[in-house]
């Protein structure tokens, strides 16, 4: 075997090993650490816009939250957290909503106003309503209509969360499909790494949203 052939095979082998290691690392990262996510609808406006591409921290809400101390920053989901979770109505989908209540909380929505334990919650910093009409509980309206504006009171079960969209009047969330089991939670948004406004054209990027941290 000539030196050139031997050297060529070594290069091919090194490249193949490097690609394999990179692929394994990418799969590990996506499965356990970070995942890309695209906002498909207006249900989380104004915090997140259609066309926002996010990095999701899949490690922060691990099952062993707090077990490893300050070296591994894991914790439980808190009220106000943005979370991604496996869809309840369609498990093939992954949804992003805001957790508004945790296990043990009594949730009520009265004329669009969120109440926890009977106390009104100030959501003015992030919630918007696109429809001024308020649907009351009624025997003449289907439940899926008035539950948008009138819900509960109901207690969030153990190991569950109550999650709502910020664009409250157009979001399909826990008001309709019920509480979200903590075992379905996938992660929390880290930042917007890219954003594109499709309606404005194929090359209309929202550069100002790059590295934006959603709250």
Question: Where do the language-model regions lie?
Answer:
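Soluble "head" domains of membrane/secretory-pathway proteins
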Residues: 2-13, 28, 32-215
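Alpha-helical transmembrane spans of integral membrane proteins, capturing the lipid-embedded, hydrophobic core
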Residues: 15-19, 23, 27
């Amino acid at each position: 075997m000539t030196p050139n052939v031997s050297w060529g095979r070594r290069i091919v082998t090194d490249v193949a090993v490097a690609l394999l290691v990179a692929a394994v690392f990418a799969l590990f990262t996506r499965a356990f650490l970070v995942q890309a996510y695209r906002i498909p609808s207006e249900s989380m406006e104004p915090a997140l816009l259609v066309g926002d591409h996010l990095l999701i921290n899949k490690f922060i809400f691990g099952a062993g939250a707090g077990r490893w101390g300050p070296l591994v920053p894991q914790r439980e989901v808190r009220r106000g957290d943005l979370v991604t979770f496996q869809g309840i109505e369609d498990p093939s989908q992954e949804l992003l909503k805001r957790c508004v209540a945790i296990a043990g909380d009594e949730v009520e929505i009265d004329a669009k106003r969120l109440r926890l334990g009977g106390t009104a919650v100030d959501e003015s910093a992030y919630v918007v309503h696109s429809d001024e009409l308020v649907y009351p509980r009624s025997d003449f309206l289907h439940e899926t209509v008035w539950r948008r504006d009138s819900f509960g009171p109901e207690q969030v079960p153990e190991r569950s969360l109550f999650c709502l969209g910020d664009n409250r009047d157009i979001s399909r969330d826990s008001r309709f499909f019920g509480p979200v089991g903590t075992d379905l939670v996938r992660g929390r948004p880290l930042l917007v790494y890219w954003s594109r406004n499709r309606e404005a054209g194929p090359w209309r990027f929202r550069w100002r949203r790059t590295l934006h941290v959603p709250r």
